[in-house]
Amino acid sequence: MDSKPLEYLLGLNSDGSVKKVSEVFENLTVTNTVCAFIALFIIVPRVFDFLRNLFSPVISIPGPLINKFSPWPLEIATFKGKSHRFARALHRKYGPIVVLAPGMISIGDSQEIKRIIQSEDWAKSEAIYGNFRQDFHRPTLLAFTEKKAYSRRKRMLSSMFGIRYIRSLEPLMKSCVDAGVAHLNKLCDNPSKSTVINLQHFIHGLAIDTIGVTTFGGSFHVVENGSHPLPSRLKAGMKISAVMQLIGWIKYIPFLPKRDPYIEKFTFDIVDKRRKEAGAVKYQDLLQHLVDVCDDSPGSEFRTSDVQDESVILLAAGSETTANAELFTVIQLLKHPEVMKKLIAEVDKWYPPSEPDRVTECAYSQTGMTYLQACIDETMRLIPGQATGSPRETSKQESLLGYKIPRGTTVFPNTQEAHLDGSIWEQPEKYIPERWLEIYSQNQTSAMPYWPFSAGSRICVGKNFAFQEMHISLTTLLRKFTFEYVPGQDETTVFRIAQQLETDSYKVRVKKRF
């Protein structure tokens, strides 16, 4: 670039002497002004970024040189939904600590991960979760980065996720599963022949209906009707949110609404309806708990907009993560018929085929059906929902595996790497539920480097809800139906908020057992 625009910008003569202010403005042209603007607002900041990254301690951490100076490789991978594979490839090549982007690293060492998310309980990354908010100043429980504010919100909502309350939701969950069973019965009208169904659509529909009835007081009937506008809009929103976590400038695009207009109206109307019905109708769902603690007075920490945002997170994150865990569990069972056979034997032991009308009860069978739990745990070990972990941030200079980590660095505690660590797990990439039976017998589950729901203060509050839903759904479906593997299905995963199948379809054969 010609150096003259920079001379004008700095107010210098060609010999380096300082110009008078009047001379600077008299000699400015449109071209010089544009070039000076580019230099001041684009080139100069990039130079400072380059120098800051060059002299940062992060420069010594293993990883491609481009990652240490540019966020583009990570942003491109994130945009494609491949950030989990991007990180996995880097760890395989460079080891347990790698640079993902300037100011962002990934750690795959299980001891350091435990230290970050559990022992020292580092705060969530503002660089990531600051972009995961519909209102920057009013985060949801998921997106709080300030520990004290998070603790206040968690205490406010904690009663919604206790074992006792989750157990009270069991009849609502069963009603959705019963609707799913009735739907499959219609499809399997010939008991001697199997029917091909889209398992992904069915399980996701079942999870969405379950969240609908337990959160919003009514099923969305996705299983029976095939679709509903709200879940469809939420799924599209999740794709955008996944990209915005790392590409935050998207939210500054003019005329881009903070909230989807349909979702905004839906959630506002249902909250308004609850308030108008106060006292007349008694609801026992999660939304009612949110409405009960809502306060729109000045200075309130939990207003109507917060109820809307929290309910959307419950619906989107709750249905998506649980559905994917269920779906991947069934896929693994179909690909490992010997495991499926063993699990069916356990199901029949607890719920004999001679008692087809017996209701599936968590209080009766959830803790006793250890092989089912082993199958679920093994699935979440191999295909964790939070594949790259919940990103944390250094509040001071830290040391990880001997490397200095500057204050304000985003650290991804890569649970995917810990779950596949060959020094801890025998044959780590194979599906072996039996490994968990020994772990259970020794009461060592919490001691293992296994964090599908994270850990510490930021452990997923919906963990018990998810396990109860999965137990009811999988046990009931395996009691009633036989599922058969259809070869040739695309099992490629993408990571958008949660790890999920890239395709919208996964076909299986299903028929009635009896």
Swiss-Prot record:
Signal peptide: none annotated. It is found in: Membrane. One of its GO terms (biological process) is secondary metabolite biosynthetic process. Keywords: Glycoprotein, Heme, Iron, Membrane, Metal-binding, Monooxygenase, Oxidoreductase, Transmembrane, Transmembrane helix. The chain crosses the membrane at residues 24-44. Disruption phenotype: Accumulates 20-hydroxy-fusarin. Its cofactor is heme. Heme binds at residue 460. Glycans are attached at residues 225, 443. Gene3D superfamilies: Cytochrome P450. Its EC number is 1.-.-.-. Induction: Expressed under high amounts of nitrogen via regulation by GLN1. Moreover, components of the fungal-specific velvet complex VEL1, VEL2 and LAE1 act also as positive regulators of expression. Finally, expression is induced under acidic conditions in a PACC-independent manner. Pathway: Mycotoxin biosynthesis. GO terms for molecular function: heme binding; iron ion binding; monooxygenase activity; oxidoreductase activity, acting on paired donors, with incorporation or reduction of molecular oxygen. It comes from the Eukaryota. One of its GO terms (cellular component) is membrane. It is a single-pass membrane protein. Pfam families: p450 (PF00067). Cytochrome P450 monooxygenase; part of the gene cluster that mediates the biosynthesis of the mycotoxin fusarin C. Within the cluster, FUS1, FUS2, FUS8 and FUS9 are sufficient for fusarin production. The roles of the other FUS members are yet undetermined. The fusarin C synthetase FUS1 is responsible for the condensation of one acetyl-coenzyme A (CoA) unit with six malonyl-CoA units and the amide linkage of the arising heptaketide and homoserine, subsequently releasing the first intermediate, prefusarin, as an alcohol with an open ring structure. Belongs to the cytochrome P450 family. This is Cytochrome P450 monooxygenase FUS8. It comes from Gibberella fujikuroi (strain CBS 195.34 / IMI 58289 / NRRL A-6831) (Bakanae and foot rot disease fungus). The lineage of its organism: Eukaryota, Fungi, Dikarya, Ascomycota, Pezizomycotina.
